[in-house]
Amino acid sequence: LAKGQSLGLVGESGSGKSTTGMAILKLLASQGAIRFAGQDLQALKRREMLPYRSKMQVVFQDPYSALNPRMSVAQVIGEGLRVHSQLNDDEIDHAICAVMQEVGLDVDTRHRYPNEFSGGQRQRIAIARALVLKPEFILLDEPTSSLDRTVQAQVLDLLKDLQQKYQLTYLFISHDLAVIRALCHHTIVMKAGEIVEHGETQSLFENPSHPYTQQLVRLSLL
């Protein structure tokens, strides 16, 4: 996965997409090698892994369960900074306000709680939480699947703008081929835990070679 690009990971439910993503972040134990900027993360001990945690972030599928309802938005977004940075309280608050503006949220709402926001706004909060640490890589695990089409398009546009501005690298997990086509440079197709096809996104979906990929493309056109 090249810096500044997006890799799509598609397949039906249960194909192993999210498991693969969690393994890459070392949130699940796995075998084999996971290389980030040339470093095999599997060889690192827990303490050695800590500097990489801020460089590798995740935005989950469900914005309703991904945010702690007992924490204010400022606490949610700033939590990582308190672990991974040496900033004081004023500097953290400034960083929170800056990233909220970046994702299109009103900074005056930062002391409110997640249940006071819509689904689309909550997903922007989740994106801000990841972005505030200035990561290089973000795992996006079906981040728009629970949103309606209009809000989904807005969030996808935001992700594309942020990628271009900060040269972010995305692994985008989805079952929605339209979303993958809109965002991803290359795509991997998974079935039953195995990669069955991969390639440049446009050519892969225009000329799929594996029967399973052909099936996914047909279903997406219905």
Each model region followed by its residue ranges:
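Conserved ABC transporter NBD signature motif
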Residues: 32-40
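ABC ATPase NBD coupling module
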Residues: 41-57, 75, 83, 203-208
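Conserved ABC ATPase "signature" region
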Residues: 90-108, 217-218
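Conserved ABC ATPase signature
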Residues: 113-117, 121
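A short, proline-enriched helix->beta-strand linker immediately N-terminal to the Walker B motif
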Residues: 132-136
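ABC ATPase "signature
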Residues: 198-199
